[in-house]
């Protein structure tokens, strides 16, 4: 199977393994090198601090012309991530460019944990609470992190 992988995916995978992003691990699946097991540590300056979040990342056949498919497997209370783990992030949708890489996507998701954006929500109920009672939303996010994101 590895013989069929485009050079770009092989190079990106090698770089991710040799030079990992701080707070993020991304390991290709043994049976499918287009599928990555991702772990992101909750940033220290966020309600997700102390948590470790599991994600799955899949590179479609069209990659890099099409964006990777990424979703959270760990439950998270965040206005830009819905109950199914889907992520509202422009570079995963209309702002995707073949110049971007897996590492850019992972860094952007990590940044989204530090800076939730209730103005562009995917989970409207969470976003509403974030806008009307941010302190309570942060408290809930911390509680969910303790409940669901412990390694």
From Swiss-Prot:
SMART domains: UBCc (SM00212). The active site is at residue 88. Keywords: Ligase, Transferase, Ubl conjugation pathway. Its EC number is 2.3.2.23. Disruption phenotype: Temperature sensitive with partial embryonic lethality at 25 degrees Celsius. Inhibited degradation of maternal membrane proteins, cav-1, chs-1 and rme-2, and ubiquitination of cav-1 with accumulation of these proteins on the maternal plasma membrane and endosome-like vesicles in later-stage embryos. RNAi-mediated knockdown prevents localization of ubiquitin and proteasomes to polyglutamine protein aggregates. Reduced growth of polyglutamine protein aggregates. Inhibited degradation of maternal membrane protein, cav-1 in embryos. GO terms for biological process: IRE1-mediated unfolded protein response; positive regulation of intracellular signal transduction; positive regulation of protein K63-linked ubiquitination; postreplication repair; protein K63-linked ubiquitination; protein ubiquitination; regulation of protein localization to cell surface. InterPro entries: UBQ-conjugat_E2_core, UBQ-conjugating_AS, UBQ-conjugating_enzyme/RWD. The keyword Ligase applies. One of its GO terms (cellular component) is ubiquitin conjugating enzyme complex. One of its GO terms (molecular function) is ligase activity. Residues 4-150 form the UBC core domain. Pathway: Protein modification; protein ubiquitination. It is an enzyme of class 2 (transferase). It comes from the Eukaryota. It catalyses: S-ubiquitinyl-[E1 ubiquitin-activating enzyme]-L-cysteine + [E2 ubiquitin-conjugating enzyme]-L-cysteine = [E1 ubiquitin-activating enzyme]-L-cysteine + S-ubiquitinyl-[E2 ubiquitin-conjugating enzyme]-L-cysteine. Belongs to the ubiquitin-conjugating enzyme family. Interacts with the E3 ubiquitin ligase nhl-1 and the E2 ubiquitin ligase ubc-1. Heterodimer with uev-1. Involved in protein ubiquitination, but has no ubiquitin ligase activity on its own. The uev-1-ubc-13 heterodimers catalyze the synthesis of non-canonical 'Lys-63'-linked polyubiquitin chains. Involved in sorting Lys-63-linked polyubiquitinated maternal membrane proteins for degradation by targeting to multivesicular bodies. May be involved in the ubiquitination and growth of intracellular polyglutamine protein aggregates. May have a role in AMPA-type glutamate receptor trafficking in neurons. PANTHER family: UBIQUITIN-CONJUGATING ENZYME E2. This is Ubiquitin-conjugating enzyme E2 13. The gene is ubc-13.
